[in-house]
């Protein structure tokens, strides 16, 4: 047997070579939590000491959850999906990612859930990138003042409560008063801008449906498609059947999709329909997470819930691409009470509100905008010059009309000036009526309001105002270049006003028929004047007691 000899120098050299070439492996630490309780869309998980706020967690059946309450021993988790398969004792793993949604132009024309997954059976969506749901709003130095108009196509709003790109304008009112109709009309009115192909004019729209019936969301999608507006609109849907966690997240998902376009230098319009249901969903989630309740059982941070959402709507500075995101949050009131908790919160956050009155709606004044309570705090700077000129006195005249109308209910005899106010006010109110899904181009609005405020409709019967307006605009479209000039210049100068005056005087003669009595025409018979002696008159005598 050969003798084994060990040379110390060889051993030392071998050890040095091994030590020089040794690379330690990466040590991995896997945190595993366990479900302690689960139910009602909420799970409590113990373990996972390094979890982040708003981090995504994965349950055994693949369902995702959102870490919310980070307590000493356990975590309160909002389950994002079906929670029936989650049971006590199951393992929970970290993903190391915060909640984000895919974004990109491929989302236009699609219906997605709050996680960005398509639910319209039209196949997968190829996303450009992803964006976190909880994003910091642009800072003060990153913003620019609102100065570009966001036309709604509604005369009552564009004339008296103008909205600018980057503004947050609240639409508030009781149920069934036309809140969603105003928002959808505004989306439809962007069709001409989209068809122009000009990026500075185009507006990408996002409609966030929170807690609505699935049939209602399907009807909205069909309406947008029928009016050619779906191609530039994304619908983020969280119907009533969704868990409360999805309804809470849906507005943030819509904002993340919109911010991707805004930071790309594009213009975005986002509708939140409606934030009352989001607040109720957040209240349900917070109570299930055992957070202390406050006023009306809402958690203490319910104001922050809406403020951090709506502050993401902005007009960006030129250095950041000059993009914008305009927000139209909707709030439902009870019995026209705008002093409730959530309505007052959102009123204080937004740049103005459009208040819809149920009494006006029931009186067939639609859109049922209460001009006295509605206001736009920053949109006036974005109003086009021609509209600003013709609508300057409109709000005042309508306010005087409402006061005089209330007074006339108790007065038996009015002077000529008061009767004139009532006559013109009734015609202006009729002029502001507008059918659903029929937005007006701004030049048509300017002509209609100019005719009303300058008294050219005072001798037109109230029931004929709508027909007169339609036929006069059609007359201008084919017989004059006034509408084209207004659309190109957005200026109502003396020459344009004089041309309009000549056109409307000539048109009225044809509308009513020739003659001095303009009320004689179709549907109006001419009678001989009655002698005063033949009229039985009653005299009301008031005696002081």
UniProtKB/Swiss-Prot annotation:
The record gives the membrane topology as:
Peripheral membrane protein
Q: What is its main location?
A: membrane
Subcellular location(s) of the protein: Cell membrane
Q: Does the keyword ATP-binding apply?
A: yes
**Annotated transmembrane regions:** none
Cellular component, GO annotation: plasma membrane; proton-transporting ATP synthase complex
The protein's enzyme class: translocase
Q: Which molecular function terms from Gene Ontology are attached? A: ADP binding; ATP binding; proton-transporting ATP synthase activity, rotational mechanism
Q: What does the UniProt keyword field contain?
A: ATP synthesis, ATP-binding, Cell membrane, CF(1), Hydrogen ion transport, Ion transport, Membrane, Nucleotide-binding, Translocase, Transport
The enzyme's E.C. designation: 7.1.2.2
Output the Pfam families linked to this UniProt entry. Answer: ATP-synt_ab (PF00006), ATP-synt_ab_C (PF00306), ATP-synt_ab_N (PF02874)
**Subunit comment for this entry?**
F-type ATPases have 2 components, CF(1) - the catalytic core - and CF(0) - the membrane proton channel. CF(1) has five subunits: alpha(3), beta(3), gamma(1), delta(1), epsilon(1). CF(0) has three main subunits: a(1), b(2) and c(9-12). The alpha and beta chains form an alternating ring which encloses part of the gamma chain. CF(1) is attached to CF(0) by a central stalk formed by the gamma and epsilon chains, while a peripheral stalk is formed by the delta and b chains.
Query: Main role?
Result: Produces ATP from ADP in the presence of a proton gradient across the membrane. The alpha chain is a regulatory subunit.
Q: What family name appears in the similarity comment?
A: Belongs to the ATPase alpha/beta chains family.
Recorded protein name is: ATP synthase subunit alpha
Protein's organism? Arthrobacter sp. (strain FB24)
């Amino acid at each position: 047997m050969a003798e084994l000899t060990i040379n110390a120098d060889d051993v030392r050299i071998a050890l040095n070579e091994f030590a020089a070439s040794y690379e330690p492996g990466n040590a991995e630490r896997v945190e595993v939590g366990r479900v302690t309780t689960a139910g009602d869309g909420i799970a409590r998980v113990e373990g996972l000491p390094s979890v982040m706020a708003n981090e995504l967690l994965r349950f055994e059946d693949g369902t995702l959850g959102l870490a919310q309450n980070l307590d000493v021993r356990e975590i309160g988790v909002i389950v994002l999906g079906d929670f029936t398969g989650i049971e006590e004792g199951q393992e929970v793993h970290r993903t190391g990612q915060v909640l984000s949604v895919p974004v990109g132009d491929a989302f236009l024309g699609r219906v997605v859930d709050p996680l960005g997954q398509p639910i319209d059976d039209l196949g997968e969506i190829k996303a450009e990138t992803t964006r976190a749901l909880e994003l910091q709003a642009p800072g003060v130095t990153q913003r620019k003042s609102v100065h570009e108009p966001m036309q709604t196509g509604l005369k009552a709003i564009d004339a008296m409560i103008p909205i600018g790109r980057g503004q947050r304008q609240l639409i508030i009112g009781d149920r069934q008063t036309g809140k969603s109709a105003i928002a959808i009309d505004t989306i439809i009115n962007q069709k001409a801008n989209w068809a122009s192909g000009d990026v500075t004019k185009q507006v990408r729209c996002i409609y966030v449906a929170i807690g609505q019936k699935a049939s209602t969301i399907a009807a909205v999608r069909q309406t947008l498609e029928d009016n050619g507006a779906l191609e530039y609109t994304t619908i983020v849907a969280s119907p009533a059947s969704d868990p409360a966690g999805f309804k809470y997240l849906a507005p943030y998902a819509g904002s993340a999709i919109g911010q991707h376009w805004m930071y790309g230098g594009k213009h975005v319009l986002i509708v939140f329909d409606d934030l009352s249901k989001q607040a109720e969903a957040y209240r349900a989630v917070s109570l299930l997470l055992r957070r202390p309740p406050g006023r009306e059982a809402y958690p203490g941070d319910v104001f922050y819930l809406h403020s951090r959402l709506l502050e993401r709507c902005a007009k960006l500075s030129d250095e950041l691409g000059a993009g914008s995101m305009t927000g139209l949050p909707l709030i439902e009131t009870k019995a026209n009470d705008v002093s409730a908790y959530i309505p007052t919160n959102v009123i204080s956050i937004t740049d103005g509100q459009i208040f819809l009155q149920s009494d006006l709606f029931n009186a067939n004044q639609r859109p049922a905008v209460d001009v006295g309570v509605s206001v736009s705090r920053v949109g006036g700077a974005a109003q086009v010059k021609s509209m600003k000129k013709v609508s300057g006195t409109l709000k005042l005249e309508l306010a005087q009309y409402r006061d005089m109308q209330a007074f006339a209910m108790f007065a038996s005899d009015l002077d000529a000036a008061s009767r004139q106010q009532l006559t013109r006010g009734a015609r202006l109110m009729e002029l502001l009526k507008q059918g659903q899904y029929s937005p007006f181009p701004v030049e048509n609005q300017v002509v209609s309001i100019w005719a009303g405020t300058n008294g050219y409709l005072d001798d037109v019967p109230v029931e004929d105002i709508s027909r007169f307006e339609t036929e006069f605009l059609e007359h201008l479209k084919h017989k004059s270049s006034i509408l084209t000039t207004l659309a190109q210049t957005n200026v109502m100068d003396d020459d344009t006003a004089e041309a309009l005056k000549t056109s409307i005087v000539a048109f009225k003669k044809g509308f009513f028929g020739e003659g001095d009595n303009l009320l004689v025409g179709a549907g109006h018979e001419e009678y001989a004047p009655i002698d005063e002696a033949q009229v039985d008159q009653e005299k009301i005598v008031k005696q002081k007691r």
